[in-house]
Amino acid sequence: MKNSLQGAMTALITPFKNQKLDEASFEKLIKRQIKHGIDVVVPVGTTGESATLTHDEHRICIEIAVDACKGTNVKVLAGAGSNATHEAIGIAKFAQAHGAHGILSVAPYYNKPTQEGLYEHYKAIANSIEIPVLLYNVPGRVGVDILPATVFRLFKDCKNIYGIKEATGSIDRCVDLLAHEPDLVVISGEDAINYPILSNGGKGVISVTANLLPDQISQLTHLAMNEEYKKAKLINDNLYTINKTLFCESNPIPIKAAMYLAGLIDTLEYRLPLCKPSKENFKKIEEVIKNYEIKGF
C-alpha cells in the first residue's frame, strides 16, 4: 500500500491585506482548521490563488502551513504545480525540504501537452522527490484532461504517485478509475459531488466549503469513509445550498466573500484578474451563510 494523504482536506484560501500576503491571518485560518477536525490542509492550490502569488509568497505559505501543523496530527499537502516541469520540480523539492507531507500537482495549464507529455511531466516530478504525489485533474481550468489510462500508468510506474484529485465534475470518471484500479486513491475535488464520490469508494475530499465549515466537512467525510452513509447523506444534504452558492462565481471569489462576511478574514481582497463578487451574488452569499453554524477561532 502506497503512503498517502486522504480524508477531510481543505483547499485553503490565501488572505491578503493591502494586496500583501497576510501571514498572521493565514496562520490563524490554519489553526482553526486543525481545531475543527480537518485531516490535511492544502495551501497554495487553485483556491489559494496560486496563479497570482509570487514564488516567494508561494514558499512562505508552505512554510506557514508546515509550522502551524507541527505537533498535531494534521498533514500538509502543498500545492506544487506548474506548466513548466522544471519549475514544478523546484516547488516540489522546496515543499519536501521544508516539511510538507506530500504535494498536489495540477496538470500543466495553457501549453496543452499530449498524454505522453503529461506522463513524462509527472514522472519527472515524482522521481525528483520521495514524498507522496497527488495528481490534480481539472480540465475546465487547465485545458487538458489526465485520462484514466495515463493515471493508471503513472500509478503503476511511480512509487510515490498514490492517487488523483478529480475535479472533472464526473462521477462516472471517478467510478471508472476506482473500478479499474481499486488501490488508487480518488479524492473529490468538487464539493457538489463529495458524497457520491465517497460512497463509491473515494478516500477523501479537497473541499472549498471546508474553509467556512471544517467541522461539517470533516464529519461528512469520516462518516462516509466509515460506511455510515445515511448519516453522511444528512450532512451532505444540509450542505447542498452552501456548496452551490460558493460556486456562483469563479472560485475562490465566493468563498473569500463568505469568509469575510463570517468575520474569519479582516479584508476582502483578491489579486487581479480576480475581483469582488457582484452586489447580487454578495447579497446571496450573505443570506445563505446565515443558515449555517460557522465555528470561530
UniProtKB/Swiss-Prot annotation:
Instruction: Name the site position(s) for Part of a proton relay during catalysis.
Output: 46, 110
Presence of keyword Transmembrane helix = no
Part of which pathway? Amino-acid biosynthesis; L-lysine biosynthesis via DAP pathway; (S)-tetrahydrodipicolinate from L-aspartate: step 3/4
The positions annotated for binding pyruvate are 47, 206
Entry-linked Gene3D superfamilies: Aldolase class I
Record PROSITE patterns? DHDPS_2
Q: How does it assemble?
A: Homotetramer; dimer of dimers.
Known function = Catalyzes the condensation of (S)-aspartate-beta-semialdehyde [(S)-ASA] and pyruvate to 4-hydroxy-tetrahydrodipicolinate (HTPA).
Q: What is this protein called?
A: 4-hydroxy-tetrahydrodipicolinate synthase
Higher taxonomy? Bacteria, Pseudomonadati, Campylobacterota, Epsilonproteobacteria, Campylobacterales
Q: What gene name does this entry carry?
A: dapA
